[in-house]
Amino acid sequence: MEDISTEKTVESLEAIRHRIAQIVQSLTHFLAILHQSESLSPWPTIHKNFNILLSQIHSLSNNLAAHSHTLQTTSIYPSLEFPVKEQEPLLTTLLRTKALPEVEEWEANTLQEYEASISSQPKKKEANDAYQKDQLWDQARIIFMEERENYSWFDFVTRRQESEGEFVSQRQLEIDRATEEQNANQMLTDILSFMKSGKR
C-alpha cells in the first residue's frame, strides 16, 4: 500500500516537474524572440507565444491544485547515493525556504507600483471628468452660439421701425452683442435649467 502511495507521489511530482520544464523552455524561447532584433517582433508571433505560455501556466496551476494534498504531506530528501558534495549548490537551492533577494525586491517593487497606480486612479478620474465637463460646456456654448446665429430673425431695425422712422444705434447693438457673448455660459445654464424643469 505504501509503495502505491509513493508511486503516485512520484508521478505527481514528475508531472509537475514536466510542466515547469515546459514553462522554462517556453520562456527561454519567448525571450529569444523578443531579443533577437532591435525592432519589436510581429504582433501575431508575440501573441502566439504568449498564449502558449499562458496555457502552460494554467496547466501547471491545475496540476498544483490537483496534487495540493500530496505536496503538503510529502517530504523529499536526497537518497544515500546522492552526490552531496558535487551537487551542493543545487541542494542548497532546492532546500531554500526563503525567496531570493532579487525576487523579494521584484515583489516589493511590484506591490509599490500597484499601490501607486491604485492611489492615483481616483485623481486621474477626477481630472478626466473635470476636463470632459469643460469640453462639454465649450461644445455646448459653441453650438448654442451657432444656433442663435442661425435663428436670429432681426436686423438693425424692424420693418415697422423703418416705416415709422425709428432707428437703432449700431453701436448699441454691438455693445449688446458683446454683453450677450460674455454671459453666454449663464444663458446656457438658464436654458438647460428651463429645459429640465420648465421654470425660468
UniProtKB/Swiss-Prot annotation:
Its main location: nucleus. Belongs to the Mediator complex subunit 8 family. This is Mediator of RNA polymerase II transcription subunit 8. Component of the Mediator complex. Transmembrane segments: none annotated. The gene is med8. The lineage of its organism: Eukaryota, Fungi, Dikarya, Ascomycota, Taphrinomycotina. GO terms for biological process: positive regulation of transcription initiation by RNA polymerase II; regulation of transcription by RNA polymerase II; transcription initiation at RNA polymerase II promoter. It is found in: Nucleus.
